[in-house]
Amino acid sequence: MNQLEIPETGSTPYIRADWDTGVLIMKGDSYPENSFALFQPVVDWVSRFLDQGNRPLKLQLELLYLNTSSIRALMDILDLLEEAHGKGVPVTVEWSYDAANERVGELAEEFKEDCTFPFAIVAKP
């Protein structure tokens, strides 16, 4: 399973992972009842992708709200990216958010502090 697509629901984000382009997109709210069930396929996909060599991976985030378990899952994904970056794999994150939602901007900044790879935070008007 090289492509991954998970439709958005009222409590889960749209997730799309494209093997050919090396782009993983997550958009929307994330407060699922079972974040493990939602994010484990994503973590598995990222692990498989990063194990395939030195191909660039870009994570594009437009997350509006994350509950605690979703934050932990995103940390797991960023840890995989950090490990790959340490091995010379080109990885990047771009987190776009509504400028009126300061809480999400602050959360993105907190994540960025723990990352040594390129991590852009873009406030949209």
Which residues does each predicted region cover?
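Structural motif
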Residues: V23, L57-K58
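Amphipathic alpha-helical interaction surfaces in cytosolic regulatory modules
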Residues: F39-V42, K58-F111
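Short, aliphatic-rich beta-strand segments
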Residues: G22-G28
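A short interface-forming secondary-structure element
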Residues: D29-E33, L63-L66
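A generic structural motif
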Residues: A120-P125
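A short, well-ordered alpha-helical element
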Residues: T12-R16, Y31-R55
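N-terminal amphipathic/basic leader segments beginning at the initiator methionine
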Residues: M1-W19
